[in-house]
Design a protein with these regions (language model features):
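Intrinsically disordered, low-complexity terminal/linker regions enriched in Pro/Ser/Gly
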Residues: 163-185
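Solvent-exposed edge beta-strands and adjacent loop segments
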Residues: 6-81, 131-146
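Disordered, low-complexity tails and leader-like regions
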Residues: 5-6, 156
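Extracellular/virion structural assembly segments
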Residues: 61-129, 159-166
Length: 185
C-alpha cells in the first residue's frame, strides 16, 4: 500500500480487488427489478471495444483514427451451482434460447472501489454504477468444467449510483462531479 498527501489529506493507494467490481442481473419478471449478484462467475473481463473512424486529413502525412463510440461487453464464465439465483436465471435462458427482446436483461455494474458518503445523518454511501440494457449472448455450456460461458453486450448504459442494504443494491439516478454524487431530484 502506498501513502501520499494530496491537498492536505493523507490518502492510501492499494490494489483494487475483484470484489470491488460487482455485476447484478435483474431476475424479475415484472417492472420492479429484483437484483441478484452474479456470484459464481470465475471471469470478469470487460472489453470496451472502441468503434473508430479513420480520417485521411490533407494536413497529415498518415491517416488518423478517432473514437466514434464504444461497444462494451462483459464476459462471464458462470460455475453451475443449482441453488444460486444467477445460475437459475442463466440456465433458464440456456434452456429457452431467447432471441430479440427476450434475450435482454437489465444489469447493474457496481464499482465499489469508487464511492461517496454524505455528511447527512444518517450518512448515505453511494457507489458508482452503470444501469445497462444488456443482451445476454449465450456461449458454451461445459458440463465437464461445470460452467456456462456468456457475454453481456452492454447496450444503453446510464451512469449513476447504487446504495446497498443487506447486500441488495438500489439504483439511484444522478450525476457524479469531482468524486461527489448528486441524486436526481
Amino acid at each position: 500500500m502506498h501513502i501520499f498527501r494530496a491537498a492536505g489529506r493523507i490518502k492510501t493507494m492499494g490494489l483494487i480487488h475483484k470484489t470491488k467490481f460487482v455485476p447484478f442481473i435483474d431476475v424479475s419478471t415484472t417492472t420492479t427489478p429484483s437484483w441478484k449478484q452474479i456470484k459464481k462467475s470465475t471471469t470478469f473481463s470487460m472489453a470496451f471495444n472502441p468503434q473508430t473512424k479513420t480520417f485521411d486529413f490533407i494536413s497529415s502525412e498518415n491517416p488518423e483514427e478517432e473514437i466514434d463510440s464504444y461497444q462494451p461487453a462483459l464476459s462471464q464464465s458462470l460455475t453451475m451451482f443449482d441453488d444460486e439465483d444467477d445460475f437459475k436465471t442463466i440456465f433458464d435462458m440456456v434452456f429457452n434460447l431467447p432471441t430479440g427482446g427476450d434475450a435482454h436483461r437489465n444489469v447493474l455494474l457496481c464499482f465499489y472501489a469508487s464511492s461517496y458518503t454524505t455528511e447527512d445523518t444518517p450518512a448515505v454511501t453511494y457507489y458508482k454504477a452503470w444501469k445497462v440494457d444488456s443482451v445476454v449472448k449465450l456461449g458454451t455450456l461445459d458440463s465437464v468444467n461445470q460452467s456456462i460461458d456468456f457475454d453481456l453486450a452492454l447496450n444503453e448504459h446510464e451512469t449513476g449510483a447504487v446504495t446497498v442494504a443487506n447486500g441488495v443494491p438500489t439504483w439511484v439516478p444522478g450525476t457524479w462531479d469531482d468524486g461527489e454524487f448528486t441524486p436526481d431530484a
